[in-house]
Amino acid sequence: MAKNLMLWLVIAVVLMSIFQNFSANNINNRKIDYSTFLSDVNQDQVREVHISGREMNIIRKDNGRYITYIPISDPKLLDNLLVKNVKIIGAAPEEQSFFTAIFISWFPMLLLIGVWVFFMRQMQVGGGKGAMSFGKSKARMLPEDQVKITFSDVAGCDEAKEEVQELVEYLKEPSRFQKLGGKIPKGILMVGPPGTGKTLLAKAIAGEAKVPFFTISGSDFVEMFVGVGASRVRDMFEHSRKVAPCIIFIDEIDAVGRQRGAGLGGGHDEREQTLNQMLVEMDGFDGNEGIILIAATNRPDVLDPALLRPGRFDRQIFVALPDIRGREKIIQVHMKKVPLGNNVDPMIIARGTPGFSGADLANLVNEAALFAARNNRDVVMMSDFESAKDKITMGSERRSMVMTEKQKESTAYHEAGHVIVGRLVPEHDPAHKVTIIPRGRALGVTFFLPKDDVLSINKNKLESQISTLYGGRLAEEIIYGVNNVSTGAHNDIKVATNLARNMVTQWGFSKKLGPLLYSEEEGEIFLGRTVTKSKHMSDETARIIDEEVKLLVEKNYNRAKKILEENLDILHAMKDALIKYETINSRQIDDLMKRKSIQSSNICTDDDNN
């Protein structure tokens, strides 16, 4: 289409240039009246005259040129010119041919008609490839041999994989289900945090199903033209009916499926009209037998309730973050293309990466391979995975950043305060590593690693986290005094305050207020939430909440302070170790907490991960 349009533009430019040339022969000659010409002749200013019919091209003695026309027959003109010794040159008048005259007269109209016919033909071109095909669906149909991903490439989400495997089996062998009265699900909504493998599952379905597979993003429906979204939905389902049974996959459906009548735009914006059309196509008067709609989102809370009901999305599959066994399987899948050293153990890596999604683990393996290549190794060692994990969890090292000895000492005391309080309060995650090498925005980082996957947190553990967060600030206060505390604890204070407020207002950990919900998470109006907010508490209750939050923070603040004051010798020893080695691991932290000296700066051993 682009080539055809360019060809038409070139033809139009050429024809217009030809048209301009017909009338541009004498564009440099100005026209004057006949009386001025006679005056120039009488004043002996004319040197040469070219006569062609009634048109005369005059050349003055000063080389000036102009054109004039003889209004009537002037029998004395030639005599006057001869008297003034003007050179007279005669020429036959130029006459346009009949075809040239017709062309010049009709060319503009023919050009307009040609442009109109061109666009009308393009509007009739199917497949969404025409110049005016704004309403054509952008869904791409993937050939069976194009998608190479299968269920063997998907790991860490066994329950979700079983659900979609049943769907593929139905498409391959529908009679086995139909003889028992079972019907194929019309829609499946895959829900889960980012990076857990929702889109990968859809690709695996495409690789296993052996049926036409259409894929489109939720943002591809709505554009700047009114009515385009609804038209694209109709066109997509129309194409799907022709090749049923088939699968339609809509990625990030929250872009078009947000709740109607909420947020900005009221009930008449283009997105809502697109959603209305999708609701009708999914379960309206027109049957869609054999069309299975699969959608993925990480924001199910903003979707319209009508979109989620049975008959449209019959199933909701939650794709959760992988547990330790799932992480091990995911790591093994990504390690297939990486040459590994003998000391690499996927289970140890999985144990040290709680909370990592499938995408995070893929990035971890890739970063480890890059570290090995950077160090000119032929295989990827366990130390490369450790360095990659540190980079992902704590940020990249900024060794080029210049820190004074005073800043290093202050940072070392700050991080040591976190570690000591974290090791001595109950039920806190063990400290895995601490460093005073600047990473990301932080001057130092303390990394706590849970022993097991965290499914829920009790009150004691939450209070221990608050105490540990204030450990860094308190270490500075004890060593340097209240007036010399730095701003390094800004984020620690923010996190601790939010934890304490949530404990009081959302999790029911306040005896005075009881197990009641006093605040809800605020939703963004652009994500389907209302603009207005209602207040669920009185001013007196708000005052009590502030008091309870303050009491909770002060309680754990004082506990952390007492712990550090009782272990000042460990605080000084850990500061010295951090300044000497810059980074210490969990085994070295154990030695320091037992008041033992440490000799080695080795921070990447297999024993640490165990």
Swiss-Prot record:
TM region(s), chain numbering: 4-24, 98-118
Topological relation to the membrane, as annotated: Multi-pass membrane protein
UniProt keywords, alphabetically: ATP-binding, Cell membrane, Hydrolase, Membrane, Metal-binding, Metalloprotease, Nucleotide-binding, Protease, Transmembrane, Transmembrane helix, Zinc
Purpose of the protein: Acts as a processive, ATP-dependent zinc metallopeptidase for both cytoplasmic and membrane proteins. Plays a role in the quality control of integral membrane proteins.
Native source species: Buchnera aphidicola subsp. Baizongia pistaciae (strain Bp)
Cytoplasmic compartment residues: 1-3, 119-610
Binding site for ATP: 192-199
Extracellular side: 25-97
GO MF annotation: an example: ATP-dependent peptidase activity
Catalytic residues, chain numbering: 415
Descriptive protein name: ATP-dependent zinc metalloprotease FtsH
Pfam families noted in UniProt: AAA, AAA_lid_3, FtsH_ext, Peptidase_M41
